[in-house]
């Protein structure tokens, strides 16, 4: 993804969406259709694919995330929202990025089930190596968020779709999944004794 790993960086003043980058990548590799699998932010992007590019999908697998409950590009950031973000960024800098990373890490660990310890080392490595650009800047709306709903209402894509959530005492999610209202071939699967990072806890 742009802004993560060794991909090119994001900027505050260029509007793009991750889903557009994904389709551009598919085009460059001459991939007409693909099985799209996403976890967390990847789940948000997979929901965007269902809303905007269902014709490029063979199936969808959305884990620990589907429609993000936030504004999309149809509603650009207002001056008031920008001011709030500036205050949040200043507060984070005062608090310290390392403190924020540790809190995030501990929250993800706590969300897990009985197999959570198997993810401790690799999860911390990923978080530790992340440059934290996103929380330190006014990021553009890189996922469609609630804009997805309007698109899905129009198309009701027939793409076979599986929504997957992990169930543990400290992993909260809604069993009423609004996106399924617009996916005639969509299903919800709950994985017991598992948290947000299900791919690391229970890869089998």
Residue locations for each model-derived region?
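Active-site loop signature of alpha/beta-hydrolase-fold enzymes
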Residues: 4-7, 68, 171, 197
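Gly/Ala-rich beta-loop-alpha elbow adjacent to hydrolase catalytic centers
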Residues: 38-42, 46
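Flexible "cap/lid" loop of the alpha/beta hydrolase fold
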Residues: 48-52, 58-93
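Conserved serine/cysteine hydrolase catalytic core
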Residues: 129-181, 187-190
């Amino acid at each position: 993804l742009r802004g993560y790993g060794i991909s090119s960086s994001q900027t505050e003043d260029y509007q793009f969406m991750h889903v557009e980058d994904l389709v551009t990548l598919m085009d460059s590799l001459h991939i007409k259709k693909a099985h799209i699998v996403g976890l967390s932010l990847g789940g948000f992007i997979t929901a965007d694919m269902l809303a905007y590019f269902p014709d490029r999908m063979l199936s969808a697998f959305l884990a620990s995330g589907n429609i993000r409950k936030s504004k999309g590009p149809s509603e650009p950031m207002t001056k008031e929202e920008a001011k709030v973000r500036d205050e949040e960024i200043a507060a984070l800098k005062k608090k310290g990025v390392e403190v924020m990373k540790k809190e995030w890490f501990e929250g993800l660990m706590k969300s897990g089930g009985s197999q959570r310890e198997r993810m401790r080392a690799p999860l911390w490595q990923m978080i530790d190596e992340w440059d934290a650009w996103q929380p330190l800047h006014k990021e553009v709306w890189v996922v469609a968020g609630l804009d997805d709903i309007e698109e899905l209402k129009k198309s009701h894509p027939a793409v076979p779709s599986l929504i997957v959530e992990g169930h543990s005492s400290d992993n909260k999610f809604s069993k009423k999944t609004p996106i399924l209202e617009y996916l005639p071939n969509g299903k919800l699967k709950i994985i017991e004794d598992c948290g947000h990072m299900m791919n690391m806890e229970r890869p089998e």
